[in-house]
Amino acid sequence: MNDNKKLGVIALAGVVISAMLGGGVYNLPQNMAQSASAGAILISWIITGIGIWFIANTFRILAAARPDATTGIYTYGELGFGKFTGFLMAWGYWICNSFANVGYAVLLMDSLNYFFPPYFKGGNNWLSIACGSLVLWIIFFIVLAGVKQASALNVIGTIGKLLPLAIFLLVLLFSFRFSTFFTDFWGLKTVAKVHDTNLGGILPQVKSTMLVTLWVFTGIEGAVVVSGRAKSQKDVSKATFLGFITCLLIYTLLSLLPLGVYSQGEISKMAPPSTAAVLMDLIGNWGSVIMNLGVIIAILSSWLIWTVMLSELPFAAAQSGTFPKIFAKENKNESPSFSLLASTIIMQIILILVHFAGNAWNMMLSITSVMALPCYLVSTLYLFKITYKNENYPTDIFAKRKYAMITAILGSIYGVWLIYAAGINYMLIAIVIYALGIPVFIKARRETSPNEKEFTKVERYFAIVLIILALIGLVYLFKFM
């Protein structure tokens, strides 16, 4: 690839930050305060920050230890555990983010309803579907023009989404009162005048926020996913660190500073996006306008970068023979043209179906969301494998082997916790979607290696187990329906 078309540390950090900071962050104060006090929220961010650090650090170490393993999440799966595992990582990531991107379309239209009521109410009426489809194909052509150009536009979008958050935090900083913040700090009292109620013990409060804190870091792998287009793998490591620190700081301040201006009870009852409700109360209607514009910019920026990311993995998998060959096509701008087109067509079909889906859409979004989580676990397990067996682990990088092994062990424990916290039932149903990819893998293997068996002996047993679990998942799916 032409070096001029490769991504530097700023563009890569923009990918990470934009992938994590979606429109949902603008309702974080209410989400966190719904059933937790300031003290519990603080503990929750400390626990999550430590856990996610081991995931982020895994990506940093692997980028340095295996600079040849570009398009990380997919490649780590294949190098560590074979082509079938690598395929499942690419397939799962691709499908789940196709659904997630359609979620951005619905959220964008619903956000536009603030400025143009009631035309886009709910985000899934026919006008919303039409306008969402228009944005979907505009993003397709932007990415088709080149990943470098899309990433440059994303840097502008990232700045655009950070500015409203900076205004919000600055206003709150000057309005912050320690006396308010420490009133019922642990949520163990009932204070009627500020709408506070006894929230129960500290542990239940922390647990109630953990699901929120887990999901807001989805996208930490952003720089790794597009690492095949990075100028340097060192830049991938730096970008992951910058993205993690920036988002952790923003999330913590967004959750805690409002509790120095309003009580937990007051914030928990605010309408989404709660940042708009807070700023409107403090500086008037302009505050609400600023934050709602921020939501729209955040959605567009995240939608753009997730489109880049979800088209990369099938492209990389096709290059190594675990996706059909046609997905390896690039255009003159070195954009993964067929992978991008296939992704956009899938998203278009899903977007049309959203109009009819109702509650089924929310359930499907929850199911597909958990499909990204095994990618984290496979990455930490791969790091453990190369450090434990000392498989050519380099001695000249920033992380010594023992340090990397500790990171891998703790990251793996946290990865298992992520899957457990997401819900075993949802994971079982998600396995149905994983199993649907098996024919695609078989087709790809027959195309690239017609004289070899599609599966190794271990992979064959793994595929059988996957199919059995998928059948169990179907039972759960029919129960939910």
Curated annotation (Swiss-Prot):
Belongs to the amino acid-polyamine-organocation (APC) superfamily. Basic amino acid/polyamine antiporter (APA) (TC 2.A.3.2) family. GO terms for molecular function: transmembrane transporter activity. This is Putative amino-acid transporter CPE0389. It comes from Clostridium perfringens (strain 13 / Type A). Its main location: membrane. It is a multi-pass membrane protein. Could be an amino acid transporter. Gene3D superfamilies: Amino acid/polyamine transporter I. Keywords: Amino-acid transport, Cell membrane, Membrane, Transmembrane, Transmembrane helix, Transport. GO terms for cellular component: plasma membrane. One of its GO terms (biological process) is amino acid transport. The chain crosses the membrane at residues 7-27, 36-56, 87-107, 127-147, 156-176, 208-228, 241-261, 289-309, 338-358, 364-384, 401-421, 422-442, 461-481. The keyword Transmembrane applies. Pfam families: AA_permease_2 (PF13520). InterPro entries: AA/rel_permease1, Amino_acid_antiprt, APC_superfamily. The lineage of its organism: Bacteria, Bacillati, Bacillota, Clostridia, Eubacteriales. It is found in: Cell membrane. NCBIfam families: 2A0302 (TIGR00905). It comes from the Bacteria.
